Amino acid sequence: MAARMGVLSVAGFRAAARAGGLLARPKQSTAVVPCRTVIASSAGAILPKPEKVSFGLLRVFTVVIPFLYIGTLISKNFAAVLEEHDIFVPEDDDDDD
């Protein structure tokens, strides 16, 4: 019984391998990069520039604000470490004399 199961599993493995399910080479993926190859019409006229989509506010909210927040957190934690180890402790000296 066990030998029969082994034969069936080997036969199933070979059938799957032949079908391309197992032991198949992964397909090489090609990256799709937007590229404008046609710059002139068939009559020879230069085509107009493509429209540029501006992501002004979206860019500000997704890039600038989070990284400013992360930078302030890092600097605040670093200042706390410096004060904790007495490396830099601001003094309240009055030099008004």
Curated annotation (Swiss-Prot):
Annotated GO biological process: calcium import into the mitochondrion; mitochondrial calcium ion homeostasis; mitochondrial calcium ion transmembrane transport
UniProtKB keywords: Calcium, Calcium transport, Ion transport, Membrane, Mitochondrion, Mitochondrion inner membrane, Transit peptide, Transmembrane, Transmembrane helix, Transport
Keyword Transmembrane: yes
Keyword Calcium listed: yes
TM ranges: 56-75
Mitochondrial intermembrane side, ranges: 76-97
Mitochondrial matrix side: 38-55
Gene Ontology molecular function terms on file: channel activator activity; protein-macromolecule adaptor activity
InterPro entries in alphabetical order: MCU_reg
UniProt transit peptide range: 1-37
Membrane topology label: Single-pass membrane protein
Job description of the protein: Essential regulatory subunit of the mitochondrial calcium uniporter complex (uniplex), a complex that mediates calcium uptake into mitochondria. Required to bridge the calcium-sensing proteins micu1 with the calcium-conducting subunit mcu. Acts by mediating activation of mcu and retention of micu1 to the mcu pore, in order to ensure tight regulation of the uniplex complex and appropriate responses to intracellular calcium signaling.
Subunit structure of this chain's protein: Component of the uniplex complex.
Similarity comment: Belongs to the SMDT1/EMRE family.
Protein name per UniProt: Essential MCU regulator, mitochondrial
Protein's gene: smdt1
